[in-house]
């Protein structure tokens, strides 16, 4: 019998799932963040942004990149733009409309709860990108420009000419480099994750292969990556 993968999606109405989850989730005391180690596999737009954000929050982050540099991630290929429900054009946009268009654009194959969460945080993502220095196109008055793109019902696409993916990745890479310099993130380039270390059903580490030496490095916990079981970061 095939085991169904648990998606870990919270219970409840779709518009309330993540709000209720955040309201009842456990918190981390700011003084304890530096004691917690987090492994982020991948340095594309998602991985680099996550590693940089977690490092800036005070966690100890170990970031693994399969390429020579995070700038070689495929996120650079995105051209058209990035959508958010800011409704700058006053054309009736909303979180639900962005959610609906995204699910429909994905041929109804996406997990709807996760897409709704994406729509909820879309405005925050744009704010984060602007803070990272992404040069989005702007109107003559200085406000961020929008255009209608793809299957969207309204004008909600933020863009940087035809180089949106490249500019987003460079912004995330700059934020990541800042945290690497600050010592909160350790970056390991030319490493490929082979497997996840599970302890009682929970991910506690990874098995990574150095693509230069072809040696395997194992870790029962993220903290061991910073000691004798992993080489110093590149």
Predicted regions and their residues:
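Conserved N-terminal/central alpha/beta ligand/cofactor-binding core
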Residues: 2-20, 25, 30, 66-204, ...
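Flexible, glycine-rich phosphate/dinucleotide-binding loops
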Residues: 47, 70, 225
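Conserved small/polar residues in nucleotide/adenosyl-binding loops
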Residues: 217-224
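Alpha-helix N-cap/helix-initiation motif
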Residues: 43, 161, 215-216
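A detector of low-complexity, intrinsically disordered, Ser/Thr/Gly/Pro/Ala-rich segments
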Residues: 41, 74, 155, 225-228
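N-terminal Rossmann-like FAD-binding beta1-loop-alpha1 element of flavoenzymes
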Residues: 38-63
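Hydrophobic alpha-helical segments, chiefly the membrane-spanning helices
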Residues: 228-234
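Core beta-strand elements of the Rossmann-like FAD/NAD(P) dinucleotide-binding domain
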Residues: 34-36, 215-216
């Amino acid at each position: 019998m095939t085991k169904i993968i648990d998606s870990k999606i919270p219970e409840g109405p779709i518009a309330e799932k993540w709000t209720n989850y955040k309201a009842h989730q456990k918190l981390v005391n700011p003084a304890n963040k530096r004691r917690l180690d987090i492994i982020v596999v991948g340095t594309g737009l998602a991985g680099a942004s996550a590693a940089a954000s977690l490092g800036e929050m005070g966690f100890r982050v170990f970031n693994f990149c399969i390429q020579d540099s995070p700038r070689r991630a495929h996120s650079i290929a995105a051209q058209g733009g990035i959508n958010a429900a800011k409704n700058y054009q006053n054309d009736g946009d909303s979180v639900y409309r962005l959610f609906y268009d995204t699910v429909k654009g994905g041929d109804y194959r996406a997990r709807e709860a996760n897409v709704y969460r994406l729509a909820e945080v879309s405005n925050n993502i744009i704010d984060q990108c602007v803070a990272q220095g992404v040069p989005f196109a702007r109107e003559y008055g200085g406000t961020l420009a929008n255009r209608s793109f793809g299957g969207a019902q309204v004008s909600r696409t933020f863009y940087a000419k035809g180089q949106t993916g490249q500019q987003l990745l460079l912004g995330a890479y700059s934020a990541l480099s800042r945290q690497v310099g600050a010592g909160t993130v350790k970056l390991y380039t030319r490493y490929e994750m082979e497997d996840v270390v599970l302890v009682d059903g929970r991910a506690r580490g990874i098995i990574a292969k150095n693509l230069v030496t072809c040696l395997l490095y194992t870790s029962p916990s993220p903290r061991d990556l910073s000691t004798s079981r992993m080489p110093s970061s590149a």
